[in-house]
């Protein structure tokens, strides 16, 4: 899938689960729950133990329509390893020089972080397909709305602090998609083995996104 189609697909999916978990086992359990909740993309942050191996495993077990993301990519060597493992898109919390070009060359997408107007514009000029507005919680939906007003042509993905309590507000403010971190996984239920609750909680984000798109 070419990068523009990847970006379009992410926009259609609307919610990107961003997994940052303390153990590989917890990450595997969370992935299983997200798949059962009918998510079609997952971003695995590289702060998760064995993240690249998990990424490779997820790529092998899912079809072409499922998008696998690598998050918290901070250097080009790691970016290439993620691409080699099958990542469809690379995500950084800040501008990583050359990462977008690496993704372009591989036909993959790059989501580059920025928060201020200058950082957002720099990420876009660097070649980001989507700008990850991070940490979104520092400014909330009002900040995103202000950024969107200045750069209406730039696809924005607020990440960091997005929850089921404010997801609708982020879409109203101009988000093309949202990245949801550990709010999407009920950690206590996961640890207790209550898969049904974890799945239902995660699925509620998809339902809210569908509601936002219908408005």
Where are these regions (language model features)?
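Glycine-rich phosphate-binding active-site loops on the catalytic face of alpha/beta enzymes
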Residues: 89-102, 133-141, 175-195
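Conserved N-terminal beta1-alpha1 strand-loop-helix module at the mouth
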Residues: 1-86, 105, 153, 164-165, ...
């Amino acid at each position: 899938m070419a990068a523009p189609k990847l970006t379009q697909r992410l926009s259609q999916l609307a919610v990107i689960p961003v997994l940052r978990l303390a153990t590989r086992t917890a990450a595997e359990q969370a992935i299983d729950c997200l798949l059962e909740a009918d998510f079609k993309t997952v971003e695995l942050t590289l702060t998760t133990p064995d993240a690249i191996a998990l990424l490779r495993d997820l790529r092998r077990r899912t079809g072409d329509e499922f998008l696998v993301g690598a998050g918290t990519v901070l250097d080009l060597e790691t970016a290439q390893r993620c691409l080699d493992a099958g990542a469809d898109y690379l995500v950084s919390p800040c501008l990583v020089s050359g990462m977008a070009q690496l993704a372009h060359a591989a036909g993959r997408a790059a989501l580059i972080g920025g928060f201020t107007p200058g950082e957002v514009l720099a990420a876009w000029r660097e070649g980001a397909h989507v700008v990850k507005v991070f940490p979104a919680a520092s400014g909330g939906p009002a900040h995103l709305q202000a950024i969107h007003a200045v750069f209406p042509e730039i696809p924005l993905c607020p990440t960091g602090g997005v929850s089921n309590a404010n997801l609708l507000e982020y879409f109203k403010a101009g988000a093309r998609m949202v990245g949801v971190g550990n709010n999407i996984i009920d950690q206590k239920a996961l640890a207790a083995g209550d898969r049904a609750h974890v799945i239902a909680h995660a699925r509620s984000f998809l339902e809210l996104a569908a509601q936002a798109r219908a408005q």
